[in-house]
Amino acid sequence: MADLNVGVVVFPGSNCDHDTEYAVASFSGVKPVMLWHNEHDLKGCDAIILPGGFSYGDYLRCGSIARFSPIMREVIDFAGQGRPVLGICNGFQVLVESGLLEGALIRNAGRKFICRQSTISVVNNSTIFTDRYEKGEVLRVPVAHGEGNYYASVETIDSLESNGQVVFRYTDAEGNATAEANFNGSLNNIAGITNKQGNVLGLMPHPERASEELLGSGDGRRVFESLFAHLAGTKRSSRGCCSTSPTRRSAS
């Protein structure tokens, strides 16, 4: 994995950048490249992660200012090439504001900031971010957000569901998508989605905060393991007869 480069974008107000750096480095031995918001160069990174936090103080709306930062122009181009982009919490909000993912993230149904352990189920394990999981597997991953309520038009929700773009869903410990498990009010209990191509994932729960048992759960670690397995496979292919890029695969 030594020849893999992963970039972690740092906005003013990011506060999970070093958590993400640690989660990646702890199992891969790869120290991520920290990319400041005003940079114009992704420095040869193979994947980009937008971490959690409160970019630009969450002024106007979460992620609405970060979308205009110079680095995001590069990230948008990078994603357009089919390259992997992962947005966690505020990173998910930035991806939505940037148009890389559909829908919106609005105030939690109870109008309060929520910081707690959540249980989510793997809806689609046929993505480059989730293929180390079993379909239907229930994970314990913490959340910390005030605007994590996923909202979209009926047509968009139907499209996300039918295309296998819903990747994680808030559920109870048995995997049931109940109203009680849906603490922020997200439509269809949606906790994470991809774009149609499957190379961009946004989720509100924090996998980097569930990357080892010492933290209370190691269930989030396989998001990063799945991504690195994909990157390593792509590197091997590019050295062989041809290169590959992430494509949308249907849920198994």
From Swiss-Prot:
Short name of one Pfam family: GATase_5
Active site: 89, 206, 208
EC number: 6.3.5.3, 3.5.1.2
Keyword Hydrolase: yes
GO cellular component: cytoplasm
InterPro entries according to UniProt: Class_I_gatase-like, PRibForGlyAmidine_synth_PurQ
Glutamine amidotransferase type-1 domain: residues covered: 6-237
Pathway noted in the entry: Purine metabolism; IMP biosynthesis via de novo pathway; 5-amino-1-(5-phospho-D-ribosyl)imidazole from N(2)-formyl-N(1)-(5-phospho-D-ribosyl)glycinamide: step 1/2
Name of the featured protein: Phosphoribosylformylglycinamidine synthase subunit PurQ
